[in-house]
């Protein structure tokens, strides 16, 4: 099992604090009905953190026309909107919300090259709120495919997410199925697609990064 390279410090801190708490309980408290449940809870929390920050092995379903999900989660928005930062035109917004139990590693949605990148520090409202897209901490990535189609996506931090990691670099290659970053704890991904893209999912669907095709771009 691979662990996200930017999360190893977080895991070391979690494991260290958990080990100290467990040791103090065992040495000083010595009351089984207190010690055993707390130690079990700490162990469960450490295992959950490992699962949370792992990089899953997935079958690659995307291409330069098939747009796959950037993250695991549930589709909460599919609507027509105006994207003013990169596309600068009417488009389709598709948003995926990640809860605490979803893998939070993010993956490139389509083959192409990075045409735009910008990071914004910001607030930490709950990611399910509409204003989170603009006011929360977020990073923005624009991708142009070999056929000239453009898509845009945002990694949005949530109420508990306090750090966004994005590996995008201007003019670097994006290949669907490869990791592009991670958001630590509950968060959201907004993807902006051309109006003529054929949407393959519906609001309420659970999607998986790399494997679930969100849309097909016109040739």
Placement of each model-derived feature along the sequence:
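Contiguous, well-folded functional domains in the mature portion of proteins
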Residues: 1-219
